Amino acid sequence: MSIAIPLGVTTSDTSYSDMAAGSDPESVEASPAVNEKSVYSTHNYGTTQRHGCRGLPYATIIPRSDLNGLPSPVEERCGDSPNSEGETVPTWCPCGLSQDGFLLNCDKCRGMSRGKVIRLHRRKQDNISGGDSSATESWDEELSPSTVLYTATQHTPTSITLTVRRTKPKKRKKSPEKGRAAPKTKKIKNSPSEAQNLDENTTEGWENRIRLWTDQYEEAFTNQYSADVQNALEQHLHSSKEFVGKPTILDTINKTELACNNTVIGSQMQLQLGRVTRVQKHRKILRAARDLALDTLIIEYRGKVMLRQQFEVNGHFFKKPYPFVLFYSKFNGVEMCVDARTFGNDARFIRRSCTPNAEVRHMIADGMIHLCIYAVSAITKDAEVTIAFDYEYSNCNYKVDCACHKGNRNCPIQKRNPNATELPLLPPPPSLPTIGAETRRRKARRKELEMEQQNEASEENNDQQSQEVPEKVTVSSDHEEVDNPEEKPEEEKEEVIDDQENLAHSRRTREDRKVEAIMHAFENLEKRKKRRDQPLEQSNSDVEITTTTSETPVGEETKTEAPESEVSNSVSNVTIPSTPQSVGVNTRRSSQAGDIAAEKLVPKPPPAKPSRPRPKSRISRYRTSSAQRLKRQKQANAQQAELSQAALEEGGSNSLVTPTEAGSLDSSGENRPLTGSDPTVVSITGSHVNRAASKYPKTKKYLVTEWLNDKAEKQECPVECPLRITTDPTVLATTLNMLPGLIHSPLICTTPKHYIRFGSPFIPERRRRPLLPDGTFSSCKKRWIKQALEEGMTQTSSVPQETRTQHLYQSNENSSSSSICKDNADLLSPLKKWKSRYLMEQNVTKLLRPLSPVTPPPPNSGSKSPQLATPGSSHPGEEECRNGYSLMFSPVTSLTTASRCNTPLQFELCHRKDLDLAKVGYLDSNTNSCADRPSLLNSGHSDLAPHPSLGPTSETGFPSRSGDGHQTLVRNSDQAFRTEFNLMYAYSPLNAMPRADGLYRGSPLVGDRKPLHLDGGYCSPAEGFSSRYEHGLMKDLSRGSLSPGGERACEGVPSAPQNPPQRKKVSLLEYRKRKQEAKENSAGGGGDSAQSKSKSAGAGQGSSNSVSDTGAHGVQGSSARTPSSPHKKFSPSHSSMSHLEAVSPSDSRGTSSSHCRPQENISSRWMVPTSVERLREGGSIPKVLRSSVRVAQKGEPSPTWESNITEKDSDPADGEGPETLSSALSKGATVYSPSRYSYQLLQCDSPRTESQSLLQQSSSPFRGHPTQSPGYSYRTTALRPGNPPSHGSSESSLSSTSYSSPAHPVSTDSLAPFTGTPGYFSSQPHSGNSTGSNLPRRSCPSSAASPTLQGPSDSPTSDSVSQSSTGTLSSTSFPQNSRSSLPSDLRTISLPSAGQSAVYQASRVSAVSNSQHYPHRGSGGVHQYRLQPLQGSGVKTQTGLS
């Protein structure tokens, strides 16, 4: 390709353009004519693409043959030469299409074109100052060699022309040459063998390339000049005529070269001025053949002269340390370079040094520039000739090799290099640079080999090498070699050994390497873990073991294979005294560090460096779940790690433990048996490991254990710090899983679901725990549930419910998370977002049904809750709420609040003002009712009073509600509503899901989907967990909103203000659908819902009279919480249940239905899942829901539903029936509120979780929610049996699921019908929904809320709810189970909530049942349940206390 073109000749341009693609003269030969060649070159785009080096000068460079008359050997190397072709080209005629589709001619076929090309080259060569003899010596050979050279540098397609192999190499710079020059020793650089070698990006490839460049290059007798350089020279000559016609300089250069060094004999300089010496396996240096005086012309640096930008077109140089390229910029400021990688002379071996003894000077002869090396100082014989760095080494991303004495500590290059003292084991420049580009596998392989070799060498030579210089560990550096040429043989031997080892290593099975890499990754992780844990162990244990000491052995183990790890441990034992330094590096030091440490107290940084990348590459390669899990565990142990770090720092100097002991500690700390580890150490570390094992935050077991431990340690915290509010939005979002209750962090809801789903594991445990030191604020995982259960069983009783209610209430109002986490860390444990979503959706669905029940007039105020019914219907704004905000004001206000929280965030937002007004009005009416309610509250309070949980809220609410019930009710209602809304907002996505559930309440798919989630298994627990969490949140809500009246108060007054602002965004389509469904529910199930609501309100008031009277929310929350012991609540609840009966579904229906429509419209509008949610739940769910809604509207749910509902109603109608219904309704009501529902589901979840989960899994669309799942499951089952009432059935299923455990035990009779038939589901699920919706909300707001409900409906609900709370609730969800043992606890709230919900939702459900599937069941039960679902869905129920 180097075609010599006379200066000024335009043909240079032409030739360059022809060869612009980097085509070689060969390519020209390939085509019969130059034009063909140009065409071919135009087609060389392939090669051009390969060689990003478009502007390489070689296109116009005079062919070496022309310029230099390349020797025949070069010709042979060339693909053109028959020999080279024979070697590189197939024996058969290669004529044919190249890969690019271009015609390729073999040598025989190219005879004519070759002659032409040779003639052209000759003519061009004549124009060039280079000797003609060289050109004449090897025309053909030169053509191909030059072509090869060009191809290599230009990456032109000529390689394609010559041989198929050429096309193979795609290395931009050398691919063509590789293809052709493989046979030629000097051009092997681009030979196929080189192509087969690894890429330059890999260490092996780079080393091979350097070897080829070092040993196989074409001797340059003259320079090859690129067209650009020629143009620049021409311009320069024109501008400075003085230099023209001075051949003497050239003659001098040639004479010097001839006299000194330019013979093609071998790679060493044969003449006196210079001698090439091999200093390393692939490195040679230029030594002075004799003493050289100052300014002596040592040698001309020959090669391909081109502009620097041409060489750097490929951008390779600063990626790799090209050793044979000289950069020069002192010629008129022109940046040029001489590329001697494949074409050059011995000057190419000159190395750069920070203390050069020679410099490059340019001379111009015959119009051509010559770069010569002049001595700038006297150079003694055999001294290395070095020049200054001609490039900015600081820009090189690889280790730059400096020729200065290795002992030079002032070398800026060595200082710059990370491991200046160490040269890479392989050719120093290439090895480091290649690390980055090296493939992970190769890098890991290479590092493993290096480490193994080093480990072996260090182990074998620990005593000997410990005294040796670290450099010996690696192949002696170039400097070393330069200084000690005699070491070359040793180095070569070492290199050979290394190569063999590399081969052996490469032969290692992939499994072995993978295992080793995995082992290293785990060891590294374990080491880190040990670092954190060991300080604690040291502080805890008497043995003072330096983590660094132990880590060093561990590191060695990590880096060496299992057998090697032991050896490395022994080695590290030797090095341990000096190991303290390696503490930070231990992972990187690994086996190398240990070995080198044995050799050298301070391991070389390079060994550490190689080992460092390998762990990284392996970790990245083997980014297994286990590794991630370890990482998460590390994060979870972050706090401990910090302590450990401090301990490490303190004990860093304490490397007193024997290496074995340290190794054992490391391994044991890693939970990995360490062979030969000290039993004592192991035991110590084992204890620490056990301690650490319990700290894995991502492990459910760990979470539960930690949470329980924290709770056990800090169970008193809720009482002490009821308001522990965490304002950290991240913590709140992750820990509470997007509790919207955090007023200060409204964006929490935007927290990624995965954040919540992982229980905010992303927040370092140290961050999370400091925020949640009490342990109640721990991750919201099953451990929360477990804690909730245990706490519900122990702490609820231990901590006054009122206090807990207060805490929850305050926390919810201020920061839902803090008090919840404090009091009901279990219940408040943030639900996983999906769980919350499902719960919310389910609740929303319920809310959709109970919208009218939320508004049900108090016609069925019945027994003790005429006020409840009255508040339900007495709220002036409640009616409005029913219309627009009825849920907020409906007697099911709690449910509405829950609904609001669940789904109608937007709705509430929309209704906020009205709600506030309505709430005020409702509070007034509620206060009026409270006049009655105080009696209820008092009666309930007397029942609830025993429950401490009711204490603060209950007591405060009760007395104050009795006295200033209105204010308290308003305040409590507002707070409860806020809390409830916060919960709902927090679960807004969840609400959307529950909404979807509610929306799809009748949809069998919904039921199916929910069951599917339940099938998940986790879904049920998760839902239960969500329910618990919601309960915690809903406790506050429940306080005010738990009782139907209280709920209304919450909705009417405080709830609306808080919930409305946080509207849940819903797609327009979804909004319209929800609105339509709400309307449908109002129309079809409106009467039922209203009646149910009224009945629920009445029953709820009856059940939570004290709650409702004292305060819609505050008192109710207290009351509900007080009934944490469901029994107490239940005795009032019994009355409430009577009231529920009084509010027969038909009555409730009539009233609730009317109310339910507005509410349901609103609630369903917001509670109905978004289109996305619907899609999520299943496209058919909305249709089923609509059909179910229509059926509900028609009041013709499946006969089974109706009969079942009627059955259930009849059961309540019976002496026990009311109780059962009350319990069921209470639970159903509770279920309706997302929190209540969640909690109810939890209740159901523990004992019934299995069954209900299964049912819900099959029927519930929101299977993801364990809590909802149970209810949904039933609902779905009901729905499946009666698809026509699918909406109602889905709703009832949800209800059933919600209260399943509590409600089912409460209304076992009616539940039994539900079990088999849609009707049964309808009745029971509604009861469950009410319980789940209301209970979670009421119980979440306060365990008292649930008890409050239960208090009023104590007689009916007390037995069954308490029973279900304790038994079924417990069975339904272990969290609830735990709570159920603590009826007063928030967990038990579900039951009390269930009671109150039963009362309150009895009306709701009645309305819902009547209007939907529930009407068939029986006016009372059906309506109540149906109302519940509506409210639960997202009408007023969510905004209210649902």
Swiss-Prot record:
Chain residue ranges for the region called Disordered: 156-202, 418-682, 792-820, 849-882, 934-965, 1036-1230, 1242-1389, 1407-1442
Keyword Iron set for record: no
GO MF, any single term: histone H3K9me2 methyltransferase activity
Keywords attached to this entry: Autism, Autism spectrum disorder, Chromatin regulator, Chromosome, Disease variant, Intellectual disability, Methyltransferase, Nucleus, Phosphoprotein, Transcription, Transcription regulation, Transferase
Residues modified as Phosphoserine: 72, 829, 852, 1198
Disease implication from the record: Intellectual developmental disorder, autosomal dominant 23: A disorder characterized by significantly below average general intellectual functioning associated with impairments in adaptive behavior and manifested during the developmental period. MRD23 patients manifest moderate to severe intellectual disability with additional variable features of brachycephaly, a low hairline, depressed nasal bridge, prominent high nasal root, tubular nose, upslanting palpebral fissures, long and smooth philtrum, micrognathia, thin upper lip, and crowded teeth.
SUPFAM superfamilies: SET domain
Lineage: Eukaryota, Metazoa, Chordata, Craniata, Vertebrata
Superkingdom of origin organism: Eukaryota
Residue ranges with Polar residues bias: 190-202, 536-552, 575-593, 793-810, 861-873, 1145-1164, 1266-1276, 1320-1334, 1374-1383, 1430-1442
Transmembrane segments: none
Gene3D superfamilies recorded: SET domain (2.170.270.10)
Assembly with partners or alone: Interacts with components of the PAF1 complex (PAF1C) such as LEO1, CTR9 and CDC73. Interacts with NCOR1. Interacts with HDAC3.
One of the GO biological process terms: negative regulation of transcription by RNA polymerase III
Protein name: Histone-lysine N-methyltransferase SETD5
Subcellular location, record wording: Nucleus; Chromosome
GO CC field: chromatin; euchromatin; nucleoplasm; nucleus; Rpd3L-Expanded complex; Set3 complex
The protein's Enzyme Commission number: 2.1.1.359, 2.1.1.367
A Pfam family reported for this protein in Swiss-Prot or TrEMBL: SET
CDD domains named among the record's database cross-references: SET_SETD5
Biased composition range(s): Basic residues: 165-189, 611-621, 1062-1076
Known function: Chromatin regulator required for brain development: acts as a regulator of RNA elongation rate, thereby regulating neural stem cell (NSC) proliferation and synaptic transmission. May act by mediating trimethylation of 'Lys-36' of histone H3 (H3K36me3), which is essential to allow on-time RNA elongation dynamics. Also monomethylates 'Lys-9' of histone H3 (H3K9me1) in vitro. The relevance of histone methyltransferase activity is however subject to discussion.
Composition-biased stretches (Acidic residues): 451-462, 492-501
